[in-house]
Design a protein with these regions (language model features):
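Surface-exposed extracellular loop regions of Gram-negative outer-membrane beta-barrel proteins
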Residues: 263-310, 417-477, 539-542, 547-551, ...
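Structural preference for beta-rich elements and adjacent junctions enriched in aromatics
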Residues: 27-424, 432
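Bacterial N-terminal signal peptides
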Residues: 11-24
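N-terminal secretory signal peptides that target proteins for export/translocation
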Residues: 1-11
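Outer-membrane beta-barrel transmembrane domain signature of Gram-negative proteins
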Residues: 240-262, 402-454, 459-462, 584-642, ...
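Outer-membrane beta-barrel proteins
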Residues: 207-215, 247-262, 303-307, 346-350, ...
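Large, well-folded core regions of big proteins
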Residues: 375-381, 387-388, 394-396, 426, ...
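Exposed, low-structure sequence patches enriched in small/polar residues
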Residues: 376, 471-763
Length: 763
């Protein structure tokens, strides 16, 4: 134990020393956020026509807010282009207009026309609305000159256990964790934009029943807006946000006063009808074709303006985009993100632990097998919102039994899943607890088959730049897992962020019997120190460089006897971000791994390459280049060379994207890995090909084709979406999966065709 404590202490001393030498200017106080009064639309007055033309007389009755400040490239300087934002409330709707003046409208960049597409590569505006004025949570709305709908939810100011190194919102990046920003929430609202001879303009109409809020007169909300002037690579804010943070930092938002907020009745029904045909070419008995016609219903009831009940019957996710293939060269499970809408909405409410490392609740465990095969969900419900000063979430889902292909035998038991989550916000800090339960049900489930996980957590804002978080959790199991499933896990994590430094460190511990079956836990039985440091200075005398971004990260795993299991260093001393976007640099990775048992890194057509148990250490060096992402033709390249266990490793990763028009894009990627080991040589190739065409901002057709030599399969997913409101509409999906290498099975493995129609019925 002394070894890893000593090593971690050295990293922590470096962090404190670096923070101590932060220039005094960095610690300067933020200017107080601006305050403005919302305009009021009389019941007798005509509502603004949402057409992207800010020319109605009603807008002239509202005082515009036009003082915007740069975050980049010159922090604190006035915006180089004028922006006017007006906010109007009336008739149960929040109206927002923006005039984004531009001295040369011909240079406006428009690169996306699909709903929820990234806004970081296009001229755009993103708004955060803190409807509870709690300085932690917000709804996010954004758009670009084509009028796309971009929306999401922010919790805990977008902060989590990762280290944010991007800014601006609407597609900012985060390395090392998952942000508490959920871009998969789809609200019911309207937006229109257009480019004019003075720049571009946009109008938004957001019904109050789309939001959650506290009723009453003369209420105050937090409000901030970021404008991305992409051809200048300039980001400006209504309320000043220092570097290192983004639009999700709602505690720094402006205050929007004078809101009269009525009680609301919010009942939504979302019925669906579906027809599908699936053909399994590998089936040797019975009919290879399964035809299905079914219907289901989602129900949403706003019990109170700040509390919502969702219910689902005969749930279906046929329209969900396919997973992107990954290559696994480790001895641990890969992480695939959730993509199903029902579980994505309000997902941050149920987040607990350290994402992708110690997750107590991972919704992909519900309704999906370990290999990603769907398991029927009979129904369920979710309650989420605020109740008596608490953020609350309750979820219950019942899955069906899984049968064999012929439908003659139950091969998988039914399960009932329950999750309860509570959080109390105190200032910008929060404290909470979670309970997760899986209970086997149905004819084949043992009576004592269950798994439970429960824990408490805290996120403490020590200062404007320092945050401390942590949790303690335990699991218990019955049945065959009873001996394994009772043990503890915990973590403490510290994060310091300002406009030059992002420094963080933490310690995790997971017992050998800790077993959250409804969570995600790639390994157990360890103690883990970790440390990260990012330094992002902006040179003033080198005109073409936006910033340098050297960074360092370290983590290691020890067993409870103090023996090293594995260790990883990422040393990135050289990274340059040019002013026009993109980045390039060189880095080195150092790894140690001491597997106690052999494991396979290649297994194809009976040929296996196995790493023996032992002690290994190796270095790899890499050069990477990412072109300006807003360019019409963009891409990236990374070349890596070095060792891998006791062999040699060479890889090249290439991506290229061509924006044919703002409505049509195509991209191709290629990852090539050449690995030579004493136990055998092998090559991995992963090739994703993507194409998208948007007929309108709500109608598009997309294709994802992938080849993965590790599995030998080529898969195709083609998806036509014609949306009307809040992510509902007509979906047509075609899937095809082929085995290109095996000589023992049919080339075509499976094929499916799905037509699904959903409709939002609002009361």
């Amino acid at each position: 134990m002394y070894r890893y404590i000593t090593r971690y202490a050295c990293c922590l001393r470096f962090a404190l020393l670096a923070a101590a030498f932060v220039p005094a200017a960095v610690a300067a106080q933020q200017p107080p956020p601006p305050t403005f009064t919302v305009g009021k639309l009389a019941d007798s007055a005509a509502s603004p026509v949402i057409d992207g033309k800010v020319n109605e007389a009603v807008w002239q009755t509202v005082q515009p807010y036009a003082t915007f400040t740069q975050q980049d490239p010159v922090e604190g300087a006035p915006a180089s282009e004028k922006t006017e934002v007006r906010v109007l409330m009336g008739k149960g709707t929040l109206y927002i207009s923006v005039i984004a003046f531009d001295s040369d409208p011909s240079k406006i960049i428009v690169s996306q026309s699909r709903r929820d597409a990234s806004l970081s590569e296009t001229d755009s505006v993103v708004m955060a609305i803190d409807t509870f004025n709690d300085n932690q949570n917000a709804f996010v709305f954004g758009t670009n000159p084509l009028g796309i709908e971009y929306d999401g939810q922010v919790a805990r100011e977008g902060q989590s256990s990762g280290v944010s190194v991007g800014g601006g919102g609407g597609g900012g990046t985060q390395r090392g964790g998952i942000s508490a920003f959920n871009p998969n929430w789809d609200g019911d609202w309207t937006v229109k934009s257009q480019i004019t001879d003075r720049g571009w303009e946009t109008e938004l109409a957001i019904p109050l029943k789309t939001l959650r809020y506290q009723t009453g007169t003369n209420q105050t909300w937090g409000f901030n807006m970021m404008r991305n002037i992409r051809h200048k690579n300039e980001q400006v804010y209504l309320a000043t946000i220092p570097r290192g943070f983004d639009i999700y930092r709602v505690s720094l938002a402006a205050k929007m006063t004078g809101l009269d907020l009525p009680a609301r009745r919010d009942i939504k029904l979302i019925p669906y009808a579906l027809g599908s045909m699936n053909k399994d070419f590998t089936r040797t008995t019975g009919d290879k074709v399964d035809k299905k016609a079914t219907a289901g219903l989602d129900f949403k009831w706003g019990i109170r303006p700040n509390l919502t009940l969702d219910a689902t019957i005969n749930t279906d996710f046929a329209q969900v985009e396919a997973d992107e293939e990954q290559v696994n060269l480790t001895r641990f499970d890969l992480f695939f993100p959730e993509k199903r809408p029902f579980f994505l909405e309000n997902a941050s409410t149920f987040q607990f632990g350290n994402p992708q490392q110690i997750d107590l609740f991972f919704s992909r465990r519900i309704g999906l097998s370990a290999t990603g095969v769907p398991i029927d969900i009979l129904g369920g419900g979710r309650l989420s919102g605020k109740l008596g000063g608490w953020n609350v979430g309750a979820l219950n889902i019942q899955t069906d039994e899984a049968e064999n292909a012929a439908g003659t035998q139950v091969v998988g038991q039914a399960n009932n899943f329950t999750t309860l989550r509570m959080q109390r916000e105190v200032g910008r800090s929060s404290y909470g607890a979670i309970f997760v339960n899986r209970k086997g049900t149905g004819s084949v489930a043992p009576s004592d088959d269950f798994n439970r996980a429960y824990g408490v957590d805290a996120n403490i804002q020590l200062s404007s730049s320092q945050r401390l978080s942590g949790f303690i959790a335990r699991t218990d199991s019955g049945g065959a897992q009873k001996a394994l499933g009772s043990d503890y896990a915990g973590r403490a994590f510290y994060n310091f962020t300002n406009n030059l430094w992002q420094i963080s460190g933490g310690y995790s511990q997971v017992g050998t019997g800790f077993n959250p079956e409804v969570g995600f836990l790639p390994r157990r039985g360890y103690r883990r120190p970790e440390f990260r440091a990012f330094f992002q200075p902006q040179p003033k005398k080198i005109a073409w460089i936006r910033r340098f971004a050297p960074h360092l990260s370290f983590n290691s795993f020890y067993d409870f006897s103090g023996n090293l299991q594995s260790e990883a260093w990422h040393i990135h001393p050289f990274e340059i971000q040019p002013k026009q976007g993109g980045r390039f640099g060189w880095f080195a990775d150092y790894a140690k791994d001491n597997p106690m048992a052999p494991f396979a890194v290649y297994n194809r057509d009976g040929r296996r390459v196995v790493i023996p148990a032992g002690q290994y250490a190796w270095w790899q060096n890499a050069f990477e280049y990412f072109h300006n992402p807003s360019a019409r033709v963009t891409g990236s390249f990374r070349f890596r060379v070095g060792d891998y266990y006791d062999g040699d490793f060479t890889s090249a990763e290439f991506t290229s994207e061509y924006r044919i028009t703002p409505k049509a894009t195509a991209s191709v990627g290629w990852t090539h890995q050449d690995i030579k080991l004493p136990y055998g040589n092998f090559v991995n190739n992963l090739v994703p090909i993507k194409a998208n065409y948007s007929f309108t901002t709500l109608a598009n057709i997309s294709a994802l084709m992938q080849y993965n030599s590790q599995t030998g399969q080529f898969s195709s997913n083609v998806r036509l979406a014609m949306l009307n409101r809040s992510g509902t509409g007509l979906f047509v999906v075609f899937n095809d999966r082929r085995d290109l290498l095996s000589s023992t099975v049919a080339e075509t493995l499976g094929r499916s065709f799905v037509v699904k129609y959903t409709r939002l019925v609002d009361f």
